[in-house]
């Protein structure tokens, strides 16, 4: 695999992690700390191919969760995690929630103290972090494609009305920044359980997004969704 493709996959993976990833710290019988990075995606041949590329570049292993129709990519080896999270030094996580998870994991790696973990785990989302300015993110395009793979939908209604949707929990400021970035005219929709959504119907904006994904391709099953969306 060429260097350019490897770097693309790293940036794309960061977007996936921001969208549907989890950075976890747990304990084993109150004695030892356990660490895990995980991505869960729908079980499809396209998503399997995408995760195999991620495995080739970043490491980890894949598990099929047939009862939930999911494929999980995960790393739970402490030494491997310490190596993999160095990627976030080059390509920072963007969502506040994932950055809080990463900060909590790093602090536990440093302390290796079950008592500290037990006392602080309820506070891991309470630290105030500055909202990322997406205009300053040099890898935004690749990150955005990964984020859309995780959170985006290409929708076609019965009347053949087409629209694009991003839905994400917790990080309302990020979605507001995306509205500004793409000059989206529709308002942010607030739903249950701190879920927020952007819907784009305007043809010129949909064309901008299609052009983006032609240059920065989707790697999983959203690629097929996009092709169907384009031809209807």
Curated annotation (Swiss-Prot):
Question: Mostly located where?
Answer: mitochondrion
The record, for SUPFAM superfamilies, names: Homing endonucleases (SSF55608)
Keyword Aminoacyl-tRNA synthetase listed: no
Where does this one sit in the cell?
Mitochondrion
A GO term from the CC aspect? mitochondrion
The text of the family note is: Belongs to the LAGLIDADG endonuclease family.
Q: What is this protein called?
A: Probable intron-encoded endonuclease aI3
State the organism named in the record: Dictyostelium discoideum
């Amino acid at each position: 695999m060429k260097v350019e493709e490897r770097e693309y996959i790293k940036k794309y993976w960061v977007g996936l992690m921001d969208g549907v990833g989890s950075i976890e710290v747990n304990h084993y019988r109150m004695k030892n700390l356990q660490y895990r990075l995980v991505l869960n995606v729908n079980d499809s041949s396209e998503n399997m191919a995408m995760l195999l590329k991620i495995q080739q570049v970043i490491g980890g292993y894949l598990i099929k969760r047939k009862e939930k129709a999911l494929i999980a990519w995960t790393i739970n080896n402490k030494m491997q995690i310490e190596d993999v999270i160095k990627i976030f030094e080059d390509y920072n996580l963007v969502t506040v929630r994932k950055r809080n998870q990463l900060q909590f994991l790093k602090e536990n790696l440093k302390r290796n103290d079950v008592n500290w973990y037990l006392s602080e785990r309820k506070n891991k989302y309470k630290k105030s972090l500055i909202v990322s300015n997406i205009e300053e993110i040099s890898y935004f395009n690749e990150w955005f494609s990964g984020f859309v793979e995780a959170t985006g939908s290409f929708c076609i209604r019965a009347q053949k009305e087409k629209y694009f949707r991003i839905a994400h929990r917790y990080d309302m400021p990020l979605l507001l920044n995306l509205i500004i970035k793409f000059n989206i005219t529709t308002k942010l929709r607030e739903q249950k359980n701190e879920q927020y959504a952007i819907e784009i119907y305007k043809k010129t904006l949909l064309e901008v997004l299609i052009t983006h994904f032609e240059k920065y391709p989707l790697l999983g099953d959203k690629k097929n969704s996009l092709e169907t969306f384009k031809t209807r």
